[in-house]
A protein has these predicted regions:
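Short terminal or interdomain "cap/linker" segment that borders an active site or interface and mediates
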Residues: 3-16, 142-179
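A structural signal for alpha-helical segments
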Residues: 24, 31, 68, 120, ...
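Hydrophobic packing residues in well-ordered alpha-helices of helical domains and bundles
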Residues: 29, 73, 125, 129, ...
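Heme-based O2/NO sensor domains and their adjacent alpha-helical segments
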Residues: 12-15, 19, 37-139
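Short low-polarity hydrophobic stretches
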Residues: 1, 51-54, 161
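Serine/threonine-rich, low-complexity linker/repeat segments that form flexible spacers/stalks
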Residues: 2, 9-30, 34
Length: 179
């Protein structure tokens, strides 16, 4: 089996072009950062409450006795906040792209601290992006007085989050059942 290395910076640039993410879009995302980050904790709480409703995602945040693991939950929320802080800056550098691919590897690999757990199902990664799309859109429309600007900013965020899907799922795309 011959493996081809993906040139992630080139692929990312192609996706940015494909979805039409412009420099103006990136500036709108950056300008919305204070609003988004001021509410990042509540966004995170909403997402984690949703994850707890599904046994296949809940298993990553509970003890062996199915009790919520406060430390693991808080550590994971902090990781999500780190992603959000990086994301609101709308960076295009190779480091950010490698970071996204690294996040994919982290979710795809068996957790060292819980060897009995499977990889995180990829549907939850794409589902979380969907939650953020919806929550950010709601925040923008609720807190921006200029509805046309809120709409343009929401569209920019939608493009930006969709560009991240492929690198965030990179480890899953290269996964083969017969490994």
């Amino acid at each position: 089996c011959m493996s081809t290395m993906i040139n992630w910076p080139a692929r990312f640039a192609e996706m940015i072009d494909f979805v039409g993410l412009s420099e103006e879009d990136r500036q709108l995302i950056k300008a919305s950062a204070p609003l988004i980050l001021a509410r990042a904790g509540s966004l995170n709480d909403f997402v984690y409450d949703a994850l707890f409703k599904y046994p296949q995602s809940r298993q990553f945040f509970v003890t062996a006795h199915d009790e919520p693991d406060a430390k693991r939950i808080e550590d994971n929320k902090q990781t999500m906040l780190s992603w959000l802080r990086a994301t609101v800056a709308a960076p295009l550098n190779d480091g950010y792209i490698r970071y996204l691919v690294g996040v994919s590897q982290m979710h795809r690999n068996i957790p060292i601290h819980r060897p009995g757990l499977p990889p995180v199902p990829p549907r939850f990664i794409s589902g979380i992006l969907s939650y953020y799309q919806t929550l950010i859109t709601d925040l923008l429309h609720e807190h921006m007085s200029d509805s046309a600007l809120a709409l343009r900013t929401s569209k920019a965020w939608n493009k930006w989050l969709m560009v991240q899907v492929e690198p965030l799922l990179a480890s899953y795309m290269s996964y083969q059942e017969d490994e």
